[in-house]
Amino acid sequence: MAVPETRPNHTIYINNLNEKIKKDELKKSLYAIFSQFGQILDILVSRSLKMRGQAFVIFKEVSSATNALRSMQGFPFYDKPMRIQYAKTDSDIIAKMKGTFVERDRKREKRKPKSQETPASKKAVQGGAAAPVVGAVQGPVPGMPPMTQTPRIMHHMPGQPPYMPPPGMIPPPGLAPGQIPPGAMPPQQLMPGQMPPAQPLSENPPNHILFLTNLPEETNELMLSMLFNQFPGFKEVRLVPGRHDIAFVEFDNEVQAGAARDALQGFKITQNNAMKISFAKK
C-alpha cells in the first residue's frame, strides 16, 4: 500500500522506525543513509511516547527530499521498512530561509483561554508556514554538529573549509560532479618552483576486502552497511570483537572494492572521525 504524499517539502517525515534504537544512534544512522541525497540541515528525533518511532529529516533542497523519499521508501531500517512522506508544513529552519518565519510565544498561546483566541491567531498557529513539528526535539548529539535553527553546512569547523561529500557521492543539487560549491576551498594552486605536498606512502596491493580505521566508538555493523551497500559488489561488513575503531568490508572483486574506497575515503561518520580506508593485507 503506497504512502500518501502531500505537496513536496524540504522536510520528510519518517515513521515505522524501530522504537528500541537509542536517540543518538538513530540520528547518526539516519544521517548516514540520507546524506547521499544532498545537504542535510537538521534531523529531529524525539523519545516522547507520542513521537516514538518517528523522525524528520530537513534537506536544504526540495529535490534532495524528493529523491530521498522515492529511493528510501520501504527501505529496511533496523529490521523495519521505513514509511516516508513529505512533512505537512515547513520547519522553522526552512521558514527562516524563505523569510516566512513567525516567532510564536507557545506559553502565552497555551495560557490564553479559547474564548479569547482570535481567528487570526488560530490561523497563525494552525496554518502558519513556519509551524514546527509537534513533539520534535532539537539537541546536541555526541559526535554530530549541534542542531541549530540557522542553516549551515554539516561538519563545518572554525578554520576549516565547509564539509563536502566525498568523491563519487551524489553531488548537491545544482552542482555537477567535481564542481566546487560556493564557499568551498578550491584546489591548492602551486607557485612557480613550489614542490607539491608529499604523497602518502604506497599501501597494500588491491584486494576485494577493505580495512577501515579511525571509526568512532558508536559505529555499528548496520551503519557501515548502509554506507557501503550503495556500491556494486558489496557483500558484508565484519567488525572486530573488542575493537570499535576498525572493521573490514568485503566486495565481490578488487575493482568494486577500490571504487568504494575512493568514494568514501575520509567520510566523516562523526564530526571528529574521518574514516580511513585501505586494502586489507592478503
Curated annotation (Swiss-Prot):
Record localization: Nucleus
SUPFAM superfamilies: RNA-binding domain, RBD
The organism's place on the tree of life at top rank: Eukaryota
Domain RRM: 10-89, 208-282
Chain spans, region Disordered: 100-130
Modification Omega-N-methylarginine, positions: R152
Alphabetized InterPro entries for the sequence: Nucleotide-bd_a/b_plait_sf (IPR012677), RBD_domain_sf (IPR035979), RRM_dom (IPR000504), U1A_RRM1 (IPR034407), U1A_RRM2 (IPR034409)
Example GO biological process: mRNA splicing, via spliceosome
One CC-aspect GO term: U1 snRNP
Modified residues (N-acetylalanine): A2
Keyword DNA-binding: no
Primary location class: nucleus
UniProt cross-references to Gene3D superfamilies, sorted A to Z: 3.30.70.330
Subunit composition and interactions: U1 snRNP is composed of the 7 core Sm proteins SNRPB, SNRPD1, SNRPD2, SNRPD3, SNRPE, SNRPF and SNRPG that assemble in a heptameric protein ring on the Sm site of the small nuclear RNA to form the core snRNP, and at least three U1 snRNP-specific proteins SNRNP70/U1-70K, SNRPA/U1-A and SNRPC/U1-C. Interacts with SFPQ; component of a snRNP-free complex with SFPQ.
Record function comment: Component of the spliceosomal U1 snRNP, which is essential for recognition of the pre-mRNA 5' splice-site and the subsequent assembly of the spliceosome. U1 snRNP is the first snRNP to interact with pre-mRNA. This interaction is required for the subsequent binding of U2 snRNP and the U4/U6/U5 tri-snRNP. SNRPA binds stem loop II of U1 snRNA. In a snRNP-free form (SF-A) may be involved in coupled pre-mRNA splicing and polyadenylation process. May bind preferentially to the 5'-UGCAC-3' motif on RNAs.
Protein's recorded name: U1 small nuclear ribonucleoprotein A
